[in-house]
Amino acid sequence: MWEEPPISGTNGSGTIFFSGCSLSCVYCQNADISRGRSGRSVSIDRLAEIMLELQHKGAHNINLVTPTHYIPSLAEAIPMARKMGLTIPIVYNTGSYDNVDALRTLSGLVDIYLPDLKYYNVKTAESYSHAGDYPRIAREAISEMYRQVGAPIFDDEGIMRRGMIVRILLLPGRVAEAKLSLKYLLDTYGDNIYVSLMNQYTPMPGMAPPLNRKVTREEYHELLDYAEKLGLKNGFTQDFGTASESFIPPFDLTGV
């Protein structure tokens, strides 16, 4: 599983995956957990303990992946973990299909937001994730996330302590839409956030065109050229050819 350098650092990010998902992406790479086929129930006390265990192992942060539908539990577990001695940042890693009122309950609890901006167009969102309202909801959610954490703060080792990194996963045949998402982010937030341009899309079996193929080198370079044209300063890119099943983590319940 790839994370941006200020998140993964040298010791890695303490990742906790949550079963289920608020979206139904047809190309989902984590279907085993997103569709409820894998996972183990834990108490709020145990969740707080897991965070402490990850800190003890040297993780730079606690990385909560697809946590949207567990916000009430997290609003209890995070303060509990802090009282038990948790000092590293909390990362909220989300597809951005998040209710703003729910996000507000995490104000002061989350240090770093790591949201996706999957789609700019309603038709794409409906076709690929059965969520035509995604563009509006995601933009509203990202705005609330930024309100909470503001501009980025790093420690002396370059590890992010606070801030937001918005991810744009380039999908095959969707360069124009990725450009629109990137321009929206830069027009709205400028250099106050980081943007991660990702090419790691890995086609799952049975996908129809164009989702049945990887992103081409030309597609990714077109997006990077556009980012340079817009003057993107705070950004991350991936080496080309990173799309593979190595980016799909094994959900073996380790550490639960």
Question: What is the predicted role of each segment?
Answer:
Residues 126-157:
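Anionic-ligand binding region
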Residues 78-91, 140-148, 217-223:
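Alpha-helix-loop-beta-strand connector modules within alpha/beta enzyme cores
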Residues 14, 62, 90-92, 113-115, ...:
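Hydrophobic faces of well-ordered beta-strands that scaffold small-molecule active sites
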Residues 107-122, 192-200:
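Non-cysteine beta-strand/loop elements that form the S-adenosyl-L-methionine
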Residues 150-256:
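Auxiliary Fe-S-binding modules of radical SAM enzymes
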Residues 34, 71, 96-99, 117-135, ...:
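Conserved radical SAM core fold
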Residues 1-112, 121-122:
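Conserved Radical SAM active-site core
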Residues 55-80, 127, 133, 143, ...:
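Conserved glycine-rich "GG(E/T)P / GGGxP" loop and the immediately following alpha-helix
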